[in-house]
A protein has these predicted regions:
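Cell-wall glycan
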Residues: 59-69
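Short clusters of hydrophobic/aromatic residues that line enzyme substrate/ligand-binding pockets
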Residues: 49-52, 65, 73
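Glycine-centered tight-turn and secondary-structure capping sites
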Residues: 26-31, 71
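Well-structured core secondary-structure elements of compact alpha/beta domains
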Residues: 1-26, 41-56, 86-93
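Short, conserved secondary-structure segments in the cores of folded domains
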Residues: 20, 73-75
């Protein structure tokens, strides 16, 4: 069974999500940005979500996490919770 590890940042607006993505692409540390801006409790841990399999997260997450590039900031991804930046840190098929 496939497994992946990822971290994310959750914010309310697409605009904020894009602004944070730009900061990270310009050299800001993903974990620091998550701690400062993410509205998800995982933000306190730098956005770390741990390891999970398909179907354990919302559909929009699964599509990105199990198909997107590893170690690249992906998003904005819109879910019922808001807008996410995702970084897949590892994946096993």
């Amino acid at each position: 069974m496939s497994k992946a590890s990822a971290r994310h940042i959750l914010v309310k607006t697409e605009e904020e999500c894009n602004a944070l993505k730009q900061q990270i692409e310009e050299g800001a540390d993903f974990a620091d940005v998550a701690k400062e801006h993410s509205t998800c409790p995982s933000g306190r841990k730098g956005g770390e979500l741990g390891t999970f399999g398909p179907g354990q997260m919302v559909k929009e997450f699964d599509e990105v996490v199990f198909n997107g590039e590893i170690n690249t900031v992906l998003g904005p991804v819109k879910t019922q919770f808001g807008y996410h930046l995702l970084e897949v840190t590892s994946r096993e098929d």
